[in-house]
Every structure is written in C-alpha cells, then in structure tokens.
C-alpha cells in the first residue's frame, strides 16, 4: 500500500484475513478491495487462516482496482458491467446504507455521510451492538498451526520444506532484533493452541460464519438495506467471518494529516455493487492526495 500511495507502483496485491487490506489501504489513502472470500485463488499466500485468507487489489483509484480485479480472475465482469463510462455515471441515488452511530464521532465519517446523502443515498443509523465472534483468535491459531506447514510443503524450496511455526520461531531467535522486534507471543499462542478434530473445527468455523451472517442479514432484512458504510477496518472482523466483501476509499485527512478510508460492505457475492458505490463516492470527493515528498 505504501508503494502505491507514493506512486512507486500502479497497484499492489494485498492479502487479508481480517483487515490487512482494508487497514493499510485506509492508512495510506488508497483504494483497497477485500472480495467475497473464495473469489480469488489463495495459492501462494502465506497463510494465517485458509478459511478466511483472500488476495485483493490495492490501487490509487477505483478503476485501477477494477482492472486488477479482472486480472486476478474475478468471476463477474467488472469492466464490462462498470466500464469507464459507467464509472463516470455511477450513482448512489436511492442506495440504502446502514451507519454505525458511534462512528459519527469521527468528523471525517460524519462529513462522508453528508456527502452520501447529498448524492441521494439513504442512511439508516444502527446501534453499536455487533456480533460476538467468540473464539476468533482460536480460529486463527488453529488454522495457522495447520496451514503454515502445508504452505512450506507446497511453496518453499527444499531447505524449508518441513518447517512449521516452531521452526520459524527458532529461526527468529537467531537474530531477534531484526526478526522479532515485537516478540513471538502470537506464535507461541499458535503452538499452545489445543488440538481439535477436523470435524469439530469445521463445525466451529461454520458456526462463527453463521453468527456473523445472521447479524448482517437480519439488519438487511429489517431495514431493507443495500449495504453498510464503516471506517477503515473497524468492522473487518465481522465482514471477514461473514465472507462479506468490502472496499475502502479515501475519506480525507484529520488535522494531523492522518488518512482515513470510508469502507463499503456489501452482502456475500455482491462485490459488483462495491465498485459502483466506491466509484460514485470517489467521483464526488476525490480525497486522495499524493504525499508532499513524493510529488514529481
């Protein structure tokens, strides 16, 4: 994301488990797209959780994001459906978004909501009760404990085949200042995670996804919603667990110059909607500014 923000690259491909595309994209004032889980191949991604991990584009604008999404193998034809001309005429008129009440304390978010309303969007405030994803860390720990050795076996050269989390920790300790400046407590948590049968683990993951999807779909039904608008990666965990796609677009800068992103969330497999919403918002705001020291 930093390389894209500084104009060193046209685009980048990030990977997200729960916020790792949305957060850096927001923090660097670029457009980040986390697709419906399973949209793009996960082959080659260093895993945290094969259940949640996904690749996704990080770009300077929505059109570039759509082009890269096509190149990555999006099953929907973003360019044909939302081509250059369509992006220019993208509209938010009549689109019904849920907004989280507490997020309105952020003045940039409050202004973004005004911009959406001026563009014809309908905003419905919802309370801040969000799904309790009990055991989310357990999911990540148990998945990585299994997935990292599989990654080394399938992607690494002969030197590293057979490696696992314990072996990575051992290697890190050889140069702790460079390799582990923040310690290895998360890795240790993975090693300490109790074993769980495949059947029980599958049931556990499916239950978590059901909880997250129930939260979103109940709100959609109750308020006749098209989607949700959030900030940065504030609701990334719930969206990830539900397999919901999300796209963050530059929302402006606070008084210290810190970028923020307006994050659109759509129902499962409704990724195409994100491009239309994001293009419409980008068109009326154009918040991205090239960092001062990187202007040519």
Where are these regions (language model features)?
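Loop/turn elements at helix/coil->beta-strand transitions in domains of secreted/extracellular proteins
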Residues: 7-11, 61, 94-95, 118-122, ...
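Short helix-loop capping/hinge segments that flank enzyme active sites or metal/cofactor-binding pockets
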Residues: 94, 142-211, 250, 256-262
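Short glycine/serine-rich loop segments
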Residues: 1-69, 242-251, 258-263
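Second-shell loop/turn segments in exported
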Residues: 53-58, 101-103, 134-138, 203-205, ...
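Sec-exported extracytoplasmic/periplasmic mature domains
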Residues: 4-6, 70-77, 117-121, 141, ...
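Glycine-rich, small-residue loops and helix-cap segments
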Residues: 9, 72, 76-79, 108, ...
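Acyltransferase
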Residues: 105-127, 149-156, 163-170, 205-222
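A short helix-breaking turn/cap at a secondary-structure junction
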Residues: 31-112, 119, 288-295
């Amino acid at each position: 994301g930093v390389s894209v923000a500084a104009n060193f690259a046209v685009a980048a491909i990030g990977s997200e488990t729960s916020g790792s595309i949305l957060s850096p994209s927001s923090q660097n004032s670029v457009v980040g797209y986390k697709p419906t889980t399973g949209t793009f191949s996960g082959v080659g991604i260093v895993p945290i959780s094969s259940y949640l991990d996904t690749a996704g584009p990080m770009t300077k604008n929505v059109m570039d994001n759509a082009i890269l999404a096509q190149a990555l193998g999006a099953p929907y034809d973003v360019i044909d459906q939302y081509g250059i001309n369509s992006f220019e005429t993208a509209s938010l008129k009549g689109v019904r978004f849920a907004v989280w009440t507490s997020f309105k304390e952020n003045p940039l978010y409050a202004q973004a909501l005004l911009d959406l309303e001026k563009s014809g969007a309908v905003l419905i405030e919802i309370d801040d009760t969000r799904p309790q994803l009990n055991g989310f860390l357990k999911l990540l720990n148990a998945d990585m404990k299994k997935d990292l050795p599989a990654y080394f076996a399938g992607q690494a050269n002969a030197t590293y085949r057979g490696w696992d989390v314990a072996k990575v920790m051992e290697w890190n300790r050889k140069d702790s200042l460079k390799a582990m400046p923040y310690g290895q407590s998360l890795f240790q948590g993975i090693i300490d995670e109790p074993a769980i049968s495949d059947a029980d683990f599958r049931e556990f993951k499916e239950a978590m996804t059901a909880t997250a999807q129930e939260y979103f779909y109940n709100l959609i039904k109750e308020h006749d919603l098209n989607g949700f608008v959030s900030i940065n990666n504030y609701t990334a965990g719930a969206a990830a667990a539900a397999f919901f796609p999300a796209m963050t677009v530059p929302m402006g800068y606070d008084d210290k110059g810190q970028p923020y992103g307006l994050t659109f969330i759509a129902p499962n497999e409704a990724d195409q909607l994100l491009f239309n919403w994001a293009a419409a918002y980008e068109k009326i705001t154009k918040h991205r500014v090239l960092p001062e020291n990187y202007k040519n």
